[in-house]
């Protein structure tokens, strides 16, 4: 399954994230840090386990977030298309 992440403000939907059955996950760009990580995992689990209840998804996403966060997993911006001060990439 291919999953595509789209960042979109979700205030009207009153949600941090939304998973659609076509493999698209919408995440609110205002999410940061651990909460962003939790919601990304949560929405991915909806796509991977579509028959799971919301409560089961919540429990799994919280557990995975806590385990991976405690192991040091973080979001890192690794884009390198902006040259450094000396002009190198």
Residue ranges and their predicted role:
Residues 1-35, 50-89:
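Metalloprotease/metallohydrolase-associated module, dominated by Zn2+-dependent proteases
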Residues 38-47:
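Active-site recognition of the HExxH zinc-binding catalytic motif
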